[in-house]
């Protein structure tokens, strides 16, 4: 059984944070939820984070600054930035993916996260490819 990937999920809106946390946990991810950028930086520094998912507009350390700090500490850590303000993304950001609130389906967010985590891990080794092909074959029979 492969270990769960850990996602640092950050939003000052408790309802949005809760919804994303539940959605990610039901897909098998471990989620560390933080309500501000300062908490998120502390959590990231403790280690074990595979991906960062953050809102842009937050008091104190905003999402763009949070991603900048995280990329300084760990450039390979993928980051997803979410905002209700599309124009904001036109400024320079270190986020790997930008999604506009209300303009994406949950399935799109989940797929973007999956792809970023695969890229971080790197290509599968030949043995992993054989195992995943066998797993897919068995799944289609079931």
Regions found by a protein language model. Give the residues of each.
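Short hydrophobic/Thr-rich beta-strand motif most characteristic of the beta2 strand and flanking loop
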Residues: 28-35, 43
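Active-site residues of response regulator receiver
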Residues: 55
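Receiver (REC) domain active-site loop signature in two-component systems and cognate sites
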Residues: 58
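Conserved acidic segment of CheY-like receiver
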Residues: 4-15, 20-24, 52
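Short amphipathic alpha-helix used as the core "switch/output" element in two-component signaling
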Residues: 42, 64-76
């Amino acid at each position: 059984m492969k270990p769960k990937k850990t996602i640092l999920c950050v939003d000052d809106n408790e309802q949005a944070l809760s919804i994303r946390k539940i959605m990610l946990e039901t897909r098998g991810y471990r989620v560390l939820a933080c309500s501000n950028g300062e908490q998120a930086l502390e959590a990231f520094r403790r280690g074990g984070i595979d991906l960062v998912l953050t809102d842009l507009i937050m008091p104190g350390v905003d999402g763009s600054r949070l991603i900048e700090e995280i990329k300084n500490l760990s450039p390979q850590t993928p980051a997803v930035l979410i905002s209700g303000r599309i124009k904001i993304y036109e400024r320079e950001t270190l986020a790997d993916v930008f999604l506009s609130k209300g303009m994406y389906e949950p399935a799109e967010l989940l797929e973007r996260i999956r792809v970023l985590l695969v890229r971080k891990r790197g290509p599968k080794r030949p043995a992993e490819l054989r195992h995943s092909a066998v797993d897919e074959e068995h799944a289609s029979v079931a």
